[in-house]
Amino acid sequence: MDTLDLYTENNYSTAKFSNQLLIVGGLVLLLPFIFNNPIMADDITVAHAPVPVIKVESNKIYQQMMDDISDESKIQKFNDSVKRKYPGALIKDIDTGIKHIKLTKYYDGKPVRINIVEIDNSIAKKYELRPALSSNTDNLHSKRTITTIAKNTNSIAAVNGTFFKPQTGVPLGTLMIDNKIYTGPIYNRVALGIFDGKYETARVELNAKLNMGNYSIKIDNINQPRMLSSYTLAYTREWGAKAPVSPKYGYQIAIKDNKIVNSSSNPLDIPEGGYVIVAPYRALQPFLASKNNISVDIKTNPEWKDVKHIISGGPYLVKDSNVYVDINAQKLSAIGGKNPRTAIGYTKNNTLIMVVVDGRENQSVGMTLVQLANFMKSVGCTNAINLDGGGSTVMYVNGQVVNNPAFKGGIAISNALVIARK
């Protein structure tokens, strides 16, 4: 939407707001006359005629008008906020309460092209932010373009999501969709927790156990590549039909309905609704002796009560309203320098801000993580995290890719964050 469109829209909203105030004011003034006017009462008595009682649900009418005015006020406030925040930017409506902003900033005299999507959750009530896998069948070994992912999820906007293994498409880090944990954390990297209408960020750990009565062992991760031969890993059907190869001295057990249904040192078929546990043989010996009353318990820490979705990234960019780039703590020093970037954050009022930065070209040189962190803070984020970037950086809005990735339309990616209809 250009500046004229915004001006027209805002003046129309202001006029509508004023008209609604006049109507409400008129109702308030008329109510005493309608229900308590003595002249009207005398007239009714003299006429000696039955008067039909018309029930006017004034409270409901008043409340509806107040709701309408409140929504108009919120929309006006959101529009004004975006205009103030991004002077000189190209601003377009994606839908009510959702804006696409396009601008260029200069760092050390060099241009950086930035695309932003802002969502006011109190207005855009028919949409939600959620992670989406590239596969329609929840297969973790999959990659698709962001356009395909967005169309498959009926989404009006999307950005690329968490890191992934380029050869296979398996997400690297915490991924929960609709309360189901698909992959566990790597190096306890920071993640975004998505609740109903609000967001939180935290470093996330896996809290998982393989249980047998009072005996249990720690499960180090779920559906992730092995990092140490001593680790105990759990795999579900989202990983694929079979578990990966066991490490040296390793063993596998397949669990379904709290029972061991198969065991071997070779890769096992993963049962539907069950697990294959891959671990050192000595760790699994006590379970092999029993084979029954065995359970798998997988949670995250923080447990985040009522969380719907989780997606990890890293490092932090903004934490508690302060620039906070913990690149070394999250073992991400390899992604320094000026590069294409993707980030997500939220304001104190839970307005969501998704950002992509083009890079590696003369027209847009990219950002360092510190530059990105300062930008996220400048647009009002109280908390923000970095997502996968570089060649993965891409933003989709209303049917098209709006940034300029190195590969036209963006490379095939493992997962995305989408703004989808509820």
Task: Specify the residue positions occupied by each region the protein language model found.
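Loop/turn positions that initiate beta-strands
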Residues: 288-297
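Conserved, well-ordered active-site substructure
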Residues: 166-186, 190-194, 310, 317-382, ...
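Bacterial N-terminal signal peptides
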Residues: 24-33
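Zymogen propeptides
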Residues: 8-11, 18-19, 35-275
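Short, Lys/Arg- and Gly-enriched loop/turn segments at beta-strand edges
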Residues: 299-311
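Short alpha-helix capping/helix-loop boundary micro-motifs
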Residues: 275-287
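N-terminal Lys/Arg-rich, disordered targeting/topogenic segments
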Residues: 1-13
